[in-house]
Amino acid sequence: MSLLDTVSRCEFLRAMPEALVARLEALAQIRTYPAGTELFIEGNAHPDFHIVAQGHVRLDMLVPQRGHIPILTAGPGDILAWSALVGNSVMTCTAVALEPVKTVAFPGHPLRQLCEAEHEVGFYVMRQLASAMSRRLLATRLQLLDLFADHVSALDLTPAIGHPGDPD
């Protein structure tokens, strides 16, 4: 399978016209990681943006007095290290391959330069990034609801004052 085939099969790039995917292919590298490998470490710089092509990656956060806590499992089509795409290469979690993993990696700085120079590429990339971040935020909200589900019934969630626009 060619690099273009691997890249174009990624959900992140599926909506992008083939000519634009070909522009990204010039930057893309296929990376493979054996099970148990740390792709990047929380607090460390990592310059590359990844799209998972095969396998699953666990994202952990270090919690004081508790150690590394799994927060999410990423699979095919999911993005990793998106901070590198927006100009902040310091990772907010640690990524560990749960099985053999293949990613399509893009160096963050050249990818940002391409997005800035070619606005159509930038539009597609940033639209997909926003969509992926929205899904990640929803997953986090659902985890928080699940975490606190036992405590919600014990709390009085009725506000002391009404919301703006509520009838008096």
Place the predicted regions along the sequence by residue.
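Cytosolic regulatory regions built on CNB/CRP/Popeye-like sensor folds
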Residues: 1-168
